[in-house]
């Protein structure tokens, strides 16, 4: 009976975590060939954002400069110049194909994220019973922990999310979200989000600690306050 009681919340957690990913991954694989064919055969202007334009232009200029430098050093005849034009043409085709693949992956990532969001939304609306079971299991698990372990876990979570060393992690996470949804990365917006999101989370954590925990477990708040290396 105890094993069955522990298995049900674990099954609910597994379904919430892996079900959206499995469905979106299957959808992505099934649409990949169709989107690739559609993107490579459609007759429309290629859209490049500023970052992509600079990246492709930089690669092309570097490639061209290398061949021109080679020509200046070797001073080969016209046949060598003809080979140079052919190589530049091949490199241009390669850059276009690479750019197309980047756009295809952006479209697929965007569709995958939308599908995951829709699945989680439906799950939160229709899966009330599973969420109630999971919530009760989490509360029971936390209740059985000692106050010292709870205080240590809270402090570790706060330092991990809003500590002075968490800036790099926030930049990486926000940049990944930008790339997944196909947005143009903006250093000013990313810097603003990196500075404001940890402050918001820090405020929420402290409000939760001194509002909720002070009522539920005063001893836990005392242990947290007694830790000398907290901010």
From Swiss-Prot:
> InterPro entries annotated for this entry?
CemA
User: Annotated Gene Ontology MF terms?
Assistant: antiporter activity; proton transmembrane transporter activity
> What are the subcellular locations of this protein?
Plastid, Chloroplast inner membrane
Stretches that traverse the bilayer: 7-27, 104-124, 154-174, 189-209
> Which keywords are on file for this protein?
Antiport, Chloroplast, Hydrogen ion transport, Ion transport, Membrane, Plastid, Plastid inner membrane, Potassium, Potassium transport, Transmembrane, Transmembrane helix, Transport
The primary location reported for this protein is: plastid
Reaction catalyzed: K(+)(in) + H(+)(out) = K(+)(out) + H(+)(in)
Q: Name one Pfam family in it.
A: CemA
Q: Which GO terms describe its biological process?
A: potassium ion transport
Which Gene Ontology CC terms are recorded? chloroplast inner membrane
Function, as annotated, reads: Contributes to K(+)/H(+) antiport activity by supporting proton efflux to control proton extrusion and homeostasis in chloroplasts in a light-dependent manner to modulate photosynthesis. Prevents excessive induction of non-photochemical quenching (NPQ) under continuous-light conditions. Indirectly promotes efficient inorganic carbon uptake into chloroplasts.
| Annotated family | Belongs to the CemA family.
Under the heading PANTHER family, the entry gives: CHLOROPLAST ENVELOPE MEMBRANE PROTEIN (PTHR33650:SF2), CHLOROPLAST ENVELOPE MEMBRANE PROTEIN-RELATED (PTHR33650)
> What is this protein's name?
Potassium/proton antiporter CemA
Specify the species. Answer: Pisum sativum
Q: Which gene encodes it?
A: cemA
């Amino acid at each position: 009976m105890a094993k069955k009681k522990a298995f049900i919340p674990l099954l609910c957690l597994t379904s919430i975590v892996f079900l959206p990913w499995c469905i979106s991954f299957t959808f992505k694989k099934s649409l990949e060939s169709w989107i690739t064919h559609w993107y490579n055969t459609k007759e429309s202007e290629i859209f490049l954002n500023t970052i992509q334009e600079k990246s492709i232009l930089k690669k092309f200029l570097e490639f061209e400069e290398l061949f021109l430098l080679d020509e200046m050093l070797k001073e080969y005849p016209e046949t060598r110049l003809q080979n140079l034009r052919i190589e530049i043409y091949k490199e241009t085709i390669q850059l276009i194909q690479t750019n197309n693949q980047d756009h295809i992956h952006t479209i697929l990532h965007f569709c995958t994220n939308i599908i995951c969001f829709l699945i989680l939304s439906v799950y939160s609306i229709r899966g009330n019973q599973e969420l109630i079971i999971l919530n009760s299991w989490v509360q029971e698990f936390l209740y059985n922990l000692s106050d010292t372990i709870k205080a240590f876990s809270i402090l570790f979570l706060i330092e991990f999310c809003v500590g002075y060393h968490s800036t790099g992690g926030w930049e990486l996470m926000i940049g990944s979200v930008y790339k997944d949804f196909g947005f143009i990365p903006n250093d000013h917006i990313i810097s603003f989000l990196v500075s404001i999101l940890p402050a918001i989370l820090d405020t929420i954590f402290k409000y939760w600690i001194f509002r909720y925990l002070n009522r539920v477990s005063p001893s836990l708040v005392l242990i947290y306050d007694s830790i000398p290396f907290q901010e």
